[in-house]
Amino acid sequence: PKISLGPELSVGVPALAEPFEAWLTGYDEDIPHRWNLFLPEGFSITGSTVVDGLPGTEEAKSLGKWCRASSCILALRGGESGPALQECLDELKTEGTVLSFGKGPDLPSGFFRLVMEDPAQRGPGVLVKALAAREVITGWPDVFILREAVGSLFLPEDGGEPRVLPLAEPLRVPDGEDERA
């Protein structure tokens, strides 16, 4: 099969739930389960979507074009972030580099969740450059960034915070069946 991965990441940036695309000559619902049996520990296929379109049509657009947004966790290494990071994120939101950011009840103190559009153009490197330009950090060693999701952008009608939705439906694992058993 032809396989391609989602928007690239800078070296050293860990990621969760990264999309990949596989062009197959045939597909059945058991393929993701069978592939999981052979993937290295720490890797698993958690969802799948069949895109059935002729080359060159909107349905068959490249994976990069499906990936409209990313969500990442950001924190400064070595302690609390202080007001400088929050001020910088406010500026990045005002200028449109960051769609939203917040501390979130599920995050430790000093950590922020950010949603950004167009992950192929606005990745972790953009954040590091902006933070360094504003002298919040000196460079990569001063910051922790985890890309937690890449997918479609969901903008709530009620004006709530934007979210990143996965591109694939979760796999269905029959009750009592372990994926790697």
Predicted features and spans:
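Short, charge-patterned binding micro-sites
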Residues: 1-25
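Core RNA-modification/binding signature centered on pseudouridine synthases
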Residues: 2-4, 84-181
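Intrinsically disordered, low-complexity boundary segments flanking structured domains
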Residues: 6-11, 31-34, 58-63
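Short, flexible turn/loop "capping" segments at secondary-structure junctions
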Residues: 12-16, 65-67, 107-108
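Unchanged
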Residues: 15, 25-41
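A generic structural signal for beta-strand entry/edge sites
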Residues: 19, 71, 109-113
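Internal, conserved structured core segments that host functional sites
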Residues: 20, 37-90
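Short beta-strand-to-loop capping motifs
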Residues: 22-28, 74-79, 114-120
